[in-house]
Amino acid sequence: DMRFSLLNFMRGKIRESLPQQMQLCGYRTTFQTVGPHALLFAGFFKSIGFDDFYDRRAQGTVRFAERDSFYYDNYLRYFREHRAASAKPMFTMIETIATHWPYDKPFMPEVRVPGGGPDTHPEVHEYLRRMSMAAIDFERFLENLRTSFPGEPFLVVSYGDHRPHVNRYLQPGLEAQLSSVLRKPIGFDSDAYITYYAARGINFSVPSLPRHDPLDIPYLPAVIAQLGGLPLSDAARERLRLLERCNGLFADCPDRPAIRAFHRRLIDSKIVLAD
């Protein structure tokens, strides 16, 4: 898989990531992944600023996909242990997988939650079931943060890394776009790439999100740093300037020279090592 080869290739070549910024601001940084990646990829994630890396074995998973509450409960335990030993703030990236494909079999069929209506495609129904479970678990997680750590401020940013496969049943023509990706690249403005992000605060007032819709993902780390009130690096400030100049677009920014110049400055300043 080219994605995994890229992680190994880029190990040690990124000098300014969001977790690295967090480290500079005194944060402990942790990553909870759903995969069995500790042996292969812990080096990459540590190289971009994660102090601790918990793969599926470290988290005690017993099956491919656990309910979201499993990973949230692990975080609550990790943070409770951290807070007992240190007053440092903590930045954590948590992966979840319960809403992921495949949808041909019910996930935790004993759990009764809303799905689709009578005429809903079976896979769409299953996806909606899992989204209902995910929404319940997420709200419960926020409530646990609120009650378990009264007065502790949290900024919780959630986002989807890709669209669910069931979109092929919901949007005519999208399946053809997705199936053609390997044969012919599709434009970055395609619906096939659109997902979501959201920010919630616990004992923390979240500033207004950028007005741009869509917002390309290369801007998200700088947006998170700004929402959290962190000091912004020169590169982060430039990303936010480009966000405004390009109206939220990055790959399809009309000012291509500005994007290329930004990439060149990242390389020339050794923020990204190109050799």
Explain the meaning of each model-derived region.
Residues 1-275:
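Solvent-exposed soluble domains appended to multi-pass membrane proteins
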